[in-house]
Amino acid sequence: QLAGGLDYLVQIAERILRSNPKYINFLAPTVTYFLTILAGTGHTAFSMIPVIVEVAKEQNIKPSAPLSIAVVSSQIAITASPVSAAVVYMTGVLEPLGWSYPTLIGLWLVTTFAGCMLTALIITLFANLDLSKDPVYQERLAQGLVKPSTGVQNKELKPGAKLSVAIFLIGVLLVLLY
């Protein structure tokens, strides 16, 4: 984070969300899931909250839907991140029972991501997500309490941001292969 790698990843994630806004209910949890997988902590999801809210509002979708799915997705991803303490601990418990680290990572990645996407599908199909029909939002909008969209935030990246992400990913790969 100090080298600017997280800012770089958030910038990429924001571009993904803004380039496909109508799929916010699926992309928001996907983005937070993979940020957590890469970082090993769910705190990375906090940096995505303002972007998710803006994109959802721009698509006339209640922000609570993609936000809640995204936050849950980031927390579930901790159980599949090769660099999280939870995975290291569970691997230590399960390896004596015959489960290898690569097998567990593969299993946890597939099942946790599938669960997140299934949840996003259920919310998208069965929840009332139309923001224009939300009386509380419409009242706040009429009172001028809703902030206008600020658009893409191109934050100046630190010089070593991209390199720090590359080095970190190589480290994660080495951990996986070890």
Give the ranges of each region predicted by the language model:
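Membrane-embedded alpha-helical segments and adjacent helix-loop junctions characteristic
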Residues: 1-59, 65
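Peri-membrane helix termini and adjoining interfacial loops of integral membrane proteins
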Residues: 4, 85-87, 91, 136-140
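Juxtamembrane/transmembrane-helix boundary motifs in multi-pass membrane proteins
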Residues: 16-20, 62-65, 99, 103, ...
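Small-residue-rich segments of transmembrane alpha-helices in multi-pass membrane proteins
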Residues: 22-26, 80, 143-147
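Hydrophobic alpha-helical transmembrane segments of polytopic
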Residues: 24-28, 67, 164-167, 171
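Alpha-helical transmembrane segments and, especially, the helix-loop junctions at the ends
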Residues: 32-49, 63-103, 107, 112-126
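Long, contiguous bundles of hydrophobic transmembrane helices that form the permeation core
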Residues: 106, 110-178
